[in-house]
Swiss-Prot record:
Species name: Mycolicibacterium paratuberculosis (strain ATCC BAA-968 / K-10) (Mycobacterium paratuberculosis)
SUPFAM superfamilies membership: Phosphoenolpyruvate/pyruvate domain
Record family assignment: Belongs to the PEPCase type 1 family.
One CC-aspect GO term: cytosol
UniProt gene name: ppc
GO molecular function: magnesium ion binding; phosphoenolpyruvate carboxylase activity
Catalytic residues in the record: H161, K593
Pfam families the record matches: PEPcase
Cofactor needs: Mg(2+)
Name of the featured protein: Phosphoenolpyruvate carboxylase
Amino acid sequence: MVEASEGTLEPIGAVQRTLVGREATEPMRADIRLLGAILGDTVREQNGQQVFELVERARVESFRVRRSEIDRAELARMFAGIDIHQAIPVIRAFSHFALLANVAEDIHRERRRAIHVAAGEPPQDSSLAATYAKLDRAQLDSAMVAEALRGAVVSPVITAHPTETRRRTVFVTQHRITELMRLHAEGHTETDDGRNIELELRRQVLTLWQTALIRLSRLQITDEIEVGLRYYAAAFFKVIPQVNAEVRNALRARWPGADLLDEPIVAPGSWIGGDRDGNPNVTADVVRRATGDAAYTALAHYLAELTACEQELSMSARLVAVTPELAALAEDCAEKARADEPYRRALRVIRGRLTATAAEILDRRPQHELDLGLPPYATPAELRADLDTVDASLRAHGSALLADDRLALLREGVRVFGFHLCGLDMRQNSDVHEEVVAELLAWAGVHPDYRSLPEDERVELLAAELGTRRPLVGDRAELSELADKELGVVRAAAHAIRRYGPAAVPNYVISMCRSVSDVLEAAILLKEAGLIDASGPEPYCPVGISPLLETIEDLHNGAAILHAMLELPLYRALVAARGQSQEVMLGYSDSNKDGGYLASSWAVYRAELALVEVARKIGIRLRLFHGRGGTVGRGGGPSYEAILAQPPGAVNGSLRLTEQGEVIAAKYAEPQVAQRNLESLVAATLESTLLDVEGLGDTAEPAYAVLDEVAVLAQRAYAELVHETPGFVDYFMASTPVSEIGSLNIGSRPTSRKPTESIADLRAIPWVLAWSQSRVMLPGWYGTGSAFEQWIAAGPQSRAERVDILHDLYRRWPFFRSVLSNLAQVLAKSDLGLAAQYAELVDDAALRRRVFGKIADEHRRTIAMHKLITGQDNLLADNPALARSVFNRFPYLEPLNHLQVELLRRYRSGDDDELVQRGILLTMNGLASALRNSG
């Protein structure tokens, strides 16, 4: 498949093409043509001329539709009644092109950055270099910087997602194609081992074509654990230590007396295997598997790197001196063949002790073991100390260049990954905690009916119980299946902490947290597992409790809950035991589903302001954990801009955020891309912490008042459609593939928390994913246009004055600018023409006209309001990279959407052919891959 000739064809919709930079993008379009041609040849060779011609017809017609805004009827006719045996290769062809186009776009970004640097241009925003320049200009006080960055941490938390399920073979093949295209972009025609690059690309594309993209069976949690861990070998083991060392060195050079960043600033986390909110498949065994596999991944990496260091550090004692400490370390390796190689002997001692550590804490044996009969390391700090001994000896005797290579990365890696690799959060719904704790209290004879108590009596009872050391139940207690399971999970977490260290399970997140008793109930469960002891003068609390505020109402009440928690002396003592630090998690997904994009965004902002004020008054350090999804409808959008859009004091040196779905692969599958994205997170965290980025000054309160009013209007407009329109749920179920997301083999977790068709009980991921697949993208924009239109018309000022107020906020306020920028991205990716095809799946014509009519009207209204407030005709005027992507890549989504509609129609009509189901699943994954942030 080659790129269609553009000629004089015009773009579709509000995303307008510009000739500016066309010359600069020619290399990317050439890469797309190359990969498309190779894929087209592969389709022809493997599936025959007839399938190839069908793919080509669909491709050409799709470009005509996208570029000329012609009617889509021909595409719909092309796929109506298509033989399923032809439909599958067509779906696979366009899905593979989406994957290959992603590669070309990523390579182009690398190319543009290299050109930018080579030209000597100023560093780009979101880079660490640009951030350092801003910090230098600010002339910050050393003591202020030290206090602001005390305990600083930036933690991307990997979570499972139903459409990010690519098999390892596909993952590795895509990585190989990326490496080959990188060589091609650099002007090479052969690989380092003499292979022809184009021929090797053909081999890899053929491998990709002949490999199943998806699994035949429903994804298991063990599969999701493996998917999450693969990013360490792919990028994290190299990039995270590099970023940590670079940031620490740069900041200490600027403020040498401040002793900054004793601990690594970037520390990854995970939810995969610990998040049991609505997922009955997460058990104690799964927690043990997740933490054990993570520890295995870390130690296996260290052993492999130590083996490589042994091969590289071959210095002879006859030629190079060593420190006494290095000589003493080497003494424990008595191998005569290496008597003259002190560094190799020292490294073998380290490898021998780490082998003993692996034997003690792992359930399976990694490669590169070396059994010297030495004692294991008790802690990662002991391992680090031995590596530091090797480093110090190298530096003391003229070998700093060697110390700064593989050994430096390994030392930094041990600092951040320890024996645990990444912190696994526990998460459960507050309703489950309540049910289990009520049972435990009844069994122990403390109270027969805890759930009947009012809130103040619950808090009093739970606080008293936390103040005692005795557990409520013993191992022989006869409990319900639910209580047994919940206690088993927290006991498995306690086991992981004992085995791998306290960083193995650092946080316990409470979903739907609405009261102080919700927090204390979780504390009771942790106490039962020995993870909380508040009875003595020095409380023990290795696991932090993080209330998750998810709905609009909960966000409004969050500060009051935090204040009441911290007013309890016993809980305050637990916070003190954790360095006077308390984490609160903010839920973007459910608040959006509850109240719409704008109301949710503003509720989160207001909640942050209030939480920061409570923390300031009480004197604790607040860390906010942002539960962001890949899409704008779930809090997504560019991370750098999102962090800078936080209110004053909300970042405070520390930030955790979830990374989900296709976003994980887009950000972290390749080392170069991963480094850029991690640097962007750190850069924004430093700027938001150390600089005044809000920019509102004395005008903050009037600005907040405007958003208070607009958010109410937006929530009302959203609720009128989603919660109050008769038949809306029926429309949603029929016009999107949400039912199929639940019934086909997608993800390990049910689509709803409860077995109902209620929007409230539906999980946020299928809610957003379904609207993304049908190209409505409703959660990312609906209600916003009406809100702005009504606010402009309702005020005491003139319409022009009200527009000027909004335009001024857009110009000066990063938060408001981010809201409108993310809104534009969603609108640009939406396509109401395609959405109309999905609407035809709704049998009730009156319902279809009523609901889709409202959606189409609001879509037009929102685009018009965006143009009015920003002054930009083009939705993506400030995002040329996405504009290029929409223009060059989105035509290839057309056939996937049309085929999905066709196959959904067949499946719902009773066609139970397994290939029809597989085709639907393939279209879902293809669209998710192409959109790169579909859920």
